[in-house]
Amino acid sequence: KRSLRDLGILVNQIIPEGGSLKCLKDLPRAWFNVVPYREVGLMTAIFLEKEYGMPYVSVTPMGILDTAEFVRQMERLVNAWASVLPEKQANYSSYIKDQTNFV
């Protein structure tokens, strides 16, 4: 959650954390889904992609390389949605550098 917040990405929902059936109706409002652990949520993300065209990131952000790839994939998805607003294009390379600089 902290990484998403640091990148300025608003979280629609965290499933199953605090989720309820009433919250499910809001799932299609998301631009994309994050599946940090493939064992939990991947089938749901695949379903949402098929049904609603909602892409997902399924890289587990552990370690330097996978965390950087996780952030790059989110950057691509954010920029795909923000393509109508060129001045709002995301560039997370400085975030990746800051997070991995002293490791």
Curated annotation (Swiss-Prot):
Pathway: Porphyrin-containing compound metabolism; chlorophyll biosynthesis (light-independent). It is found in: Plastid, Chloroplast. GO terms for molecular function: 4 iron, 4 sulfur cluster binding; ATP binding; metal ion binding; oxidoreductase activity. Its EC number is 1.3.7.7. It comes from the Eukaryota. Its cofactor is [4Fe-4S] cluster. One of its GO terms (biological process) is light-independent chlorophyll biosynthetic process. GO terms for cellular component: chloroplast. It holds the Pfam family Oxidored_nitro. Keywords: 4Fe-4S, ATP-binding, Chlorophyll biosynthesis, Chloroplast, Iron, Iron-sulfur, Metal-binding, Nucleotide-binding, Oxidoreductase, Photosynthesis, Plastid. Its main location: plastid. InterPro entries: ChlB/BchB/BchZ, Nase/OxRdtase_comp1. Belongs to the ChlB/BchB/BchZ family. Protochlorophyllide reductase is composed of three subunits; ChlL, ChlN and ChlB. Forms a heterotetramer of two ChlB and two ChlN subunits. Component of the dark-operative protochlorophyllide reductase (DPOR) that uses Mg-ATP and reduced ferredoxin to reduce ring D of protochlorophyllide (Pchlide) to form chlorophyllide a (Chlide). This reaction is light-independent. The NB-protein (ChlN-ChlB) is the catalytic component of the complex. This is Light-independent protochlorophyllide reductase subunit B. It comes from Salvinia auriculata.
